[in-house]
Amino acid sequence: MLLKRRIGLLLSMVGVFMLLAGCSSVKEPITADSPHFWDKYVVYPLSELITYVAKLTGDNYGLSIILVTILIRLLILPLMIKQLRSSKAMQALQPEMQKLKEKYSSKDQKTQQKLQQETMALFQKHGVNPLAGCFPILIQMPILIGFYHAIMRTQAISEHSFLWFDLGEKDPYYILPIVAGVATFVQQKLMMAGNAQQNPQMAMMLWIMPIMIIVFAINFPAALSLYWVVGNLFMIAQTFLIKGPDIKKNPEPQKAGGKKK
């Protein structure tokens, strides 16, 4: 029930952000005269930041995307730490929550209400907010979606090249899409490591997300693929630094319902 509420809240907020972002097409170049609130106060400032850093680095827009991606990730790092701590606190309560589920296994309404009441009492006892892990994600989302728009709609980016690829064209050798997919897989694997249990949905997403990233990266300009690669590599380092002790203690998560060794 609580998981459904968290997912419902996240999907609702994603819908709001996508609606805001959808007011303007990613094919429309971003300018100071762009009319929408989203463009004027989110996308355009990020586009200007990319352009400013590019000028500082000798008109190198590829390097600018790398540096601005790292800067944004550093700025939202406190939110990520808060999210991971909340997730860790919820994970620590899983054994007690499982006992409550076994105690109130009947599916009738009265039993389920009792289960919900005792679960909430458990959260209050340990000072855990089950929705606390959602809010950092919601704050990050408009920044990351806005940065995606800024990369796609800053016309100067498409006119420059970096390393072996044109930023406005697809990677001709598919190197960036593959690296982006592998980095996504590794980052998710590290996020799941150290968890006592692993539900089937998490295991499925471990494989689905990298495949989706590869497919998207193949079909989008290389500038966006570069952003995904840098962002995921940063998150791998970030996750390892924050969750390092947990990863070393329990490198392979146990599947839910599996037998204990």
From Swiss-Prot:
Compartments it resides in: Cell membrane
Lipid attachment locations (S-diacylglycerol cysteine): C23
Source organism superkingdom: Bacteria
Disulphide bonds in the chain: none
Matching CDD domains: 5TM_YidC_Alb3
Gene Ontology annotations for the cellular component aspect, listed alphabetically: plasma membrane
Lipidation (N-palmitoyl cysteine): C23
Knockout consequences: Essential for sporulation, disruption affects the expression of prespore-specific genes but not early mother-cell-specific genes, i.e. cells do not progress beyond stage III of sporulation. A double spoIIIJ-yqjG deletion is lethal. Genetic competence increases about 20-fold in the single disruption.
Main location, first listed in the record: membrane
Signal peptide segment: 1-22
Topology in the lipid bilayer: Multi-pass membrane protein
Keywords for this protein: Cell membrane, Chaperone, Lipoprotein, Membrane, Palmitate, Protein transport, Signal, Transmembrane, Transmembrane helix, Transport
GO molecular function terms listed in the Swiss-Prot or TrEMBL record: membrane insertase activity
TM segment ranges: 61-81, 131-151, 174-194, 204-224, 225-245
Cited InterPro entries: YidC/ALB3/OXA1/COX18, YidC/Oxa/ALB_C, YidC/YidC1/YidC2_Firmicutes, YidC_ALB_C
A biological-process GO annotation: protein insertion into membrane
Biological role: Required for the insertion and/or proper folding and/or complex formation of integral membrane proteins into the membrane. Involved in integration of membrane proteins that insert both dependently and independently of the Sec translocase complex, as well as at least some lipoproteins. Also involved in protein secretion processes. Essential for sporulation by activating sigma factor SpoIIIG/SigG after engulfment is completed in the prespore, maybe by acting on SpoIIIAE. It has an overlapping, although partly distinct, function compared to YqjG(MisCB).
Subunit (UniProt): Mostly monomeric, it may also form dimers. Interacts with SpoIIIAE. Forms a complex with the F(1)F(0) ATP synthase in which can be found the alpha, beta, gamma, delta and epsilon subunits of F(1) and a, b and subunits of F(0). YqgA is found in the same complex.
Family: Belongs to the OXA1/ALB3/YidC family. Type 2 subfamily.
Listed name of the protein: Membrane protein insertase MisCA
